[in-house]
Swiss-Prot record:
<dbReference type="InterPro" id="IPR001240">
    <property type="entry name" value="PRAI_dom"/>
</dbReference>
<comment type="similarity">
    <text>Belongs to the TrpF family.</text>
</comment>
<dbReference type="InterPro" id="IPR044643">
    <property type="entry name" value="TrpF_fam"/>
</dbReference>
<keyword id="KW-0057">Aromatic amino acid biosynthesis</keyword>
<keyword id="KW-0822">Tryptophan biosynthesis</keyword>
<dbReference type="Pfam" id="PF00697">
    <property type="entry name" value="PRAI"/>
</dbReference>
<dbReference type="GO" id="GO:0004640">
    <property type="term" value="F:phosphoribosylanthranilate isomerase activity"/>
</dbReference>
<keyword id="KW-0413">Isomerase</keyword>
<dbReference type="GO" id="GO:0000162">
    <property type="term" value="P:L-tryptophan biosynthetic process"/>
</dbReference>
<dbReference type="InterPro" id="IPR013785">
    <property type="entry name" value="Aldolase_TIM"/>
</dbReference>
<keyword id="KW-0028">Amino-acid biosynthesis</keyword>
<protein>
    <recommendedName>
        <fullName>N-(5'-phosphoribosyl)anthranilate isomerase</fullName>
        <ecNumber>5.3.1.24</ecNumber>
    </recommendedName>
</protein>
<dbReference type="InterPro" id="IPR011060">
    <property type="entry name" value="RibuloseP-bd_barrel"/>
</dbReference>
<comment type="pathway">
    <text>Amino-acid biosynthesis; L-tryptophan biosynthesis; L-tryptophan from chorismate: step 3/5.</text>
</comment>
Length: 210
């Protein structure tokens, strides 16, 4: 099995971003959603990105943002990729002409294969836990058996992942990447560096990376 990629999401501090990179994370996620306790503003995001070494992917997470709001952020912050975590349509996601990930909140009866096909321009599909009225960051895992095999897009597994369960998640789902936020925190938006290291070690152990 090839090495599973990883993103540490909900970064709000420079020191947490650097800890994620030092532990081996491929990407960091910055949340531009004011209702989230992990949200950052433009100045915070710029400072975090400026502190990063080369070859670390920066992902901006948006939830049903207005076109004006999103364009203002894109003009001010050098993001590598967008993550749409709301009800954005394929056309809306495509309209920004940036590489993007589309998040789906998984519940029983969902046709994940059809959603992958609908968002054909996405670089990957992120699968998260469905909780009514909550767009993400619930800290709860979902039933991984709901994910069908042979999906047409790289799958990024999220939703309640921790250092203790990510190994089992990788073994069962065999995703392209894993995404964690609350599972490596000591408080909302404040990362626990030892948990980040433990999470990344579990990812390496499970994916066979050297």
């Amino acid at each position: 099995m090839s090495a599973v990629r990883s993103k540490i999401c909900g970064i709000t501090r420079i020191e947490d971003a650097l800890a994620a990179v030092e532990a081996g994370a491929d990407a960091i996620g910055l949340v531009f959603y004011a209702k989230s306790p992990r949200s950052v503003n433009v100045l915070q995001a710029r400072a975090i990105i400026a502190a990063l070494p080369p070859f670390v992917t920066t992902v901006g997470l948006f939830v049903n943002a207005s076109r004006c709001e999103l364009n203002e952020t894109l003009d001010a912050v050098p993001l590598d990729m967008l993550q749409f975590h709301g009800d954005e349509t394929p056309d809306e996601c495509e309209s920004y002409q940036r590489p993007y990930i589309k998040a789906l909140r998984v519940k029983s009866g969902d046709d994940i294969a059809a959603a992958c096909a609908a968002y054909s321009g996405a670089r990957g599909i992120l699968l998260d836990t469905y909780v009514e009225g909550v767009p993400g960051g619930t800290g709860e895992a979902f039933d991984w058996s709901l994910i069908p095999p042979g999906l047409s897009k790289p799958i990024i597994l999220a939703g309640g992942l921790t250092p203790t369960n990510v190994g089992a998640a990788i073994e069962q789902v065999q995703p392209y990447a894993v995404d964690v936020s609350g599972g490596v925190e000591q408080g909302k938006g404040i990362k626990d560096h030892s948990k980040i290291r433990a999470f990344m070690q579990a990812v390496r152990n499970s994916s066979g990376a050297m």
